[in-house]
A protein has these predicted regions:
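Membrane-lumen/periplasm interface segments of specific transmembrane helices
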Residues: 235-350
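Perimembrane helix-loop-helix junctions
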Residues: 175-181, 208-245
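Start-transfer (signal-anchor) and selected internal transmembrane alpha helices
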Residues: 1-34, 220-221, 232-243, 356, ...
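Extracytosolic helix-loop segments that constitute the early lumenal/periplasmic catalytic or substrate-binding loops
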Residues: 29-80, 84, 94-96
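Short acidic/glycine- and proline-prone juxtamembrane loop motifs at membrane-interface regions
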Residues: 151-165
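Specific aromatic-rich, kink-prone transmembrane helix
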Residues: 124-127, 164-181, 193-195, 407-411
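Membrane-interface transmembrane helices that cradle and orient dolichyl/undecaprenyl
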Residues: 132-133, 172-190, 198, 220-223
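Transmembrane-helix signature of polytopic, membrane-embedded enzymes
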Residues: 101-107, 122-148, 166-167
Length: 443
């Protein structure tokens, strides 16, 4: 009798593992097909070993060649970014580059490394769902949505620090969930190290810190109320701060000291002369309804950037297709790509509605609700502010905030009741359509 009761859970576990493996295999197949420059966000060109363009590619080569952090007289290009991703890229260079050999071939290997990080994001997302005791068809559907959804196909092939940052953020969130269940020094030290490493990958990883702080405060007050003891928690909080703050902030503090670089520095655009400039678009166009061209586009048409100034739809477009990287050869494929963008919008809104419901449900642990709700809110609000501070088309991209999808999937997983059929069909439709397009239209 006991084995028959356990069987459904075991079947779900096996099915989820198959989904994870299939998703990883498909991502690797996609990465093998496309060049490392398929998603060319701030890549720059490869270095000639004498001069450096300041893009992500030459940053990696600089670290490999000189084995030191940037020592120029000022910060420029991508060198203001913390170096962890680029250091790992330099290590891959050391493994695969031979003097006089193909630099491009080594960048392809780095692309594979980045794709493995994308696969790991899905695995950590599944583990978070398991920690939150999400079960049944809901667990399978959400796992499939993470595994086969479109964003991680292209994000894994983009040679930027966004994918690794998202992985380390997700791992931090997992540890905070475990700590909230049972506060232990070992768990909080892991969380501190992971957050610090995320910040050493990209400074904006710190945006999940307010949510972590809310969890700490809630558990602290709850412990005082229930047990009247606070000293063990104070030691744990001290350990978290002493590890995460000095290590995570070390690179930006170095640059502030050496180059007087602001702690929140971002490489500036060209102002109103930037061909992507959209700062003169109205507030309604930015935050209201998207243009018809944007609604029915499967890529950004750079000759008309102001048609793509709407933050919401630009986020959905890049979630599905980055800036339009698929090779769409006929009307059927173009129509399917537009439908994928629409399904990303519908899926995100459905997950958001479920997460909001979870946030206001007293049946879910308050610490988890704070982590997911505050985490999503702070990251997304910061993204909107960023899009206005730097009004360019390229600043509205899901790559900056993919961690919000982990918050939404976890939040929906905790939603009371079964997943409605319409939502399940929407998520599965998105997963299957994205997989078909990224398999058929990669090159």
């Amino acid at each position: 009798m006991g084995s028959r009761i356990a069987a459904p859970g075991q079947r779900e576990e096996k099915l989820c593992l198959l989904i994870l493996l299939a998703g990883a295999a498909l991502k690797l197949c996609y990465a093998i097909q496309v060049p490392y420059s398929a998603s060319p966000h701030d890549l720059g060109g490869p270095s000639d070993w004498v001069t450096y363009s300041g893009g992500h590619l030459s940053y990696i080569q600089y670290l490999y060649q000189l084995r030191q952090l940037w020592q120029g007289d000022k910060m420029w290009g991508m060198f203001y970014h913390p170096p962890l991703f680029h250091m790992l890229g330099a290590l891959v260079f050391g493994l695969f580059y031979k003097s006089g050999g193909s630099i491009q071939a080594v960048f392809e290997w780095i692309q594979i490394f980045n794709t493995l990080a994308a696969c790991a994001i899905v695995f950590v997302g599944w583990r978070i769902l398991k920690h939150l005791e999400v079960k049944g068809r809901k667990l399978v559907t959400l796992t499939a949505f993470l595994s086969f959804g479109p964003t991680l196909y292209w994000l894994g092939t983009a040679l930027t620090n966004d994918c690794l940052m998202t992985l380390l953020q997700a791992m931090t969130i997992e540890q905070i969930i475990l700590w909230a269940k049972k506060p232990q020094m070992g768990v909080i030290i892991k969380a501190a190290l992971l957050l610090a490493l995320a910040m050493l990958t990209k400074t904006s990883a710190v945006l999940i810190a307010p949510a972590i702080g809310c969890v700490f405060l809630y558990v602290f007050l709850k412990t005082i109320q229930e047990k009247g003891k606070i000293s063990p928690l104070l030691w744990q909080f001290a350990a978290f701060l002493l590890i995460s703050v000095p290590l995570g902030c070390s690179y930006v503090l170095r640059n502030w000291h050496l180059f007087q670089m602001p702690l929140n520095y971002v490489a500036p655009g060209w102002g109103v002369n930037d061909p992507q400039y959209i700062g003169d678009c109205t507030l309604f166009r930015r935050l209201g309804l998207p243009s018809l061209k944007q609604l029915f586009s499967a890529r950004i048409h750079w000759d008309a950037p102001k048609k793509y100034c709407n933050i919401w739809w630009q986020t959905f477009l890049t979630m599905a297709l980055d800036e339009g990287i698929l090779v769409l050869r006929n009307l059927a494929q173009k129509t399917a790509a537009v439908l994928l963008v629409w399904s990303c919008a519908g899926s995100t809104l459905a997950l958001l509605a479920g997460t909001v419901r979870t946030f206001f449900s007293r049946r879910t642990d308050a610490a988890v609700r704070l982590l997911l709700g505050v985490g999503y809110g702070v990251v997304f609000l910061s993204y909107v502010v960023f899009a206005f501070r730097y009004p360019r088309v390229c600043t509205m991209n899901t790559r900056y905030i993919y961690i919000t999808m982990i918050f939404l999937v976890a939040g929906y997983g905790l939603r009371e009741g079964e997943m409605p059929r319409a939502v399940r069909a929407l998520l599965w439709g998105n997963s299957l359509l994205s997989t078909a397009l990224y398999f058929l239209c990669a090159v």
